Amino acid sequence: MFEVEALVEKNRLVVRIWGDVDGEEARRVGDAAVGVIDRLRPDFDLLSDLQGVTALHAEALVQLRRIMEAARARGFRRVVRVVGRSVDAALRFERTSRELGYDAYLAFSLEEAERLLDGGG
């Protein structure tokens, strides 16, 4: 399952995914995220919450690349990834991030990630 939200007032894209993410769902996440990026101003932040991911299809990495290419074209500033106990998903996303030339800050809870992005820690 997933949820994608453009927080226009905070200039932030929030992507939450949890459970088993198959190829079709990964494509829907990509479509939803790419579809709302244009609602954000340049220098937006991206918060991805993976802490509830239990299984991740390889298509998720293809969609991560797609989302980040759209984010780069729009002009993102920072990425914070909430990993919780989803170590496998975190490692796979981190490898892809490095291949794309950016580093994501890691957080262990949504609250910690929001504090980081809001400038409080």
Predicted regions and their residues:
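Amphipathic, Lys/Arg-enriched alpha-helical "gate/interface" segment within cytosolic domains
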Residues: M1-G121
